[in-house]
Amino acid sequence: MRPILVSYLLTVSFAAIASPAPMDSTAEFRAAGSLAMQGDMKSALSHLTRVQLKELKDDRQRSVATCMRERFVEKKAPPIAADIDPWAGRVLSAYRRYWTRTMLGTQAATAGERELAATLALMVTLPQGAGPAPGLDVLEPLLIAKLEARGYHALFGITAPLREFMLWRKQTDETYDIDLPEGREPVHVAMMDDFVSLGWLGYAICDYHHTGGWATPERLFAVRSAYDLDSESFKVSYLAHEGQHFADYRRFPGLAQPDLEYRAKLVEISKARTSLFDLLDAFDADGADSRETPHPWADRQVIKNLSEKLLKGEKPSAAMLKRFSVEQLNAAAVELLAEDTRQRAPKATKT
């Protein structure tokens, strides 16, 4: 099975991690979260262990910091809930071990995937010709079939940089007509509820931060509990973001995930109004330079390219961009998306 491209919809933002000055506990917590969302728990713990819980003013942050320490410092995995099917629980336990070892750097990613595949291969009936060591792309359809027979829905594939496993029990279908900068996009959205696993990102940060949805060539998927369905966040950071993926899958087949995310985040900036400055702050805080982490890379590119267009040589930053009006920022994002489309359109025509 070709791994499914998953899009993060970030439910919180973490502050930038680079700081030459000593950080207080809130800043240390945010730095830990920023690194954890990139799958680098080893570096995250260097900040998390300096957090003084009593200095955190947010009860939720204290709870999350305690949970992360239990999982990744004390190595105490949370118990599988008693109402979970035992076989599904074994699959989840295998993924949790893989996520933990890979994020902590105690096992290389490739070795972790091989060990995960070997564990899962013992839990399914392999087809003829699968070979003695089938990979995860072979195993995932078999796992999905077995989970569905037990009343679950599942997502596998890759949420860079790790293999993914999300598991939920309820799903209903909705239809939306999404207004994008380059045209309207009618799409189907599967609303998901009653989650058992919110994926590696949710596991890393104790569900303080997790995937809120994704797109496939057929339809969109939304974690219902992540959104107020009447809010701008849902309409912009989910529907518009993921709707752009849907359009780009069709228009630019094979477009790399970092570029898909860049285009979708430009659409967010083009449509956001009340949430626009918060989006700029989030993109600025969470940005990174490596295309190996597509969302942070796209965050940085959006801030960088908006700054080049509007600031005329000044240092890129959300603070500087917020000197411009909502309308100016919306228009600049539309222009950047159009420029990106023009660069890609001839290539798409030739394929």
Predicted regions located by residue number:
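Positively charged n-region of N-terminal signal peptides that target proteins for export
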Residues: M1-I4
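Bacterial N-terminal signal peptides
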Residues: V6-A16
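N-terminal low-structure segments adjacent to metalloprotease catalytic domains
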Residues: S19-H153
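Post-HExxH zinc-binding segment in Zn-dependent metallohydrolases
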Residues: R96-W99, A256-R291
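Active-site scaffold of zinc-dependent metalloenzymes
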Residues: P161-S231
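Post-HEXXH active-site segment of zinc metalloproteases
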Residues: E218, E232-S233, Y249-L266
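Active-site recognition of the HExxH zinc-binding catalytic motif
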Residues: V236-R250
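Long, well-structured alpha-helical subdomains associated
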Residues: R273-T351
